[in-house]
Amino acid sequence: LRAAKQIRKKLGQPATAAFVFAGGEFLAGLEEFCEILRVDGHIRDVAGCVAAGQIRDGEEFGGAEGFSLLAMTGGVSEPVGGDAAKVVPAGADGAVWIQSGIDPDFDARLADWDRRFPGVPLAGGVTGRARDGGPCVFLNGQRVEVVTIAAAGGLELVPSAAQGCRPIGEPLTVTRADSNILYSLGGQPAYRVLERAFESLSDAEKSHAKGNLFAGLAGNEYAEEFGSGDFLIKNIIGADPDSGAVVIGGLPRVGQTLQYQIRSRESALADLGRAFKPAAKAKKRAVAALLFSCVGRGENFFGVESPDASQLRSALGRKPVAGFFSAAEIAPVGGTTALHGYTAVAAVFAVKGGAVGSAK
């Protein structure tokens, strides 16, 4: 109730919509919680999810109780909830997608988004499932599988993604693959290429490489050079030295460029500065942002408090930010919308006019 009154006072007028990311203790009383925000906060629509932790402005609260809230008085469409993302309004300049759980058709739906809405950036996050097996995403107190909110009315969405990886070895063309099994790169066994990439690492990097090696699929095949941020990062699930095969958590295509990657604290810190440059460039036009940060990041990985949130604050200044710790993240890479892991995705709302506010 206090937060609802605070947001109403700060905005000075009714809010079009509010993004709300709450701790698990709110799930049982979700309908009442949203009703209080809507009635006492003068908020038309309340959309968000229950998650493992919240992000409030420049701070991250992993596993904490409470909630973060970002309310907007205009520039966004009416939220759409249901079992799948629906059509966005004509003229939309981006959208936020929040989903509960990952299903086998997730990548196909993202590809369908790119076909139906070319040039409309999509950013978002995935939360888990509730103990009762139901979704943790909600819209106006009702639990739904997906909620989508589009930027419209002169407001645009500027996405950024920090993956925390750097390429190792060399980029090579996939020459043989079957489903998620990678057999050869540049005519060489995929495992042998992985071995060479590993041998190129320093002793310090080799010592912590276990569990931190990934496969990077090029997001843009027409790039002349590849660097951090140019790849869709996929897990390496297994490898067979005898057959030379490497199994990854993605579907490589013959002819696609692939380069192995390493994830480390140092590479992740360096990547943060690069990744949020689009946000920094939009600073003068930005009014607010959402941040979706993987549960595998945060203080436990970086060794510093609120690494993603503080970096975004450095890029945007004291613009209001809300977000949550996610199980997976959604953002475009090289013009292709993709599902990511171990990533921090920022969705910056940049608008010619409008008003926003945030409450803790």
Task: Tell what function each PLM region has.
Residues 1-40, 44, 49-302, 306-319, ...:
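Small-residue-enriched flexible segments
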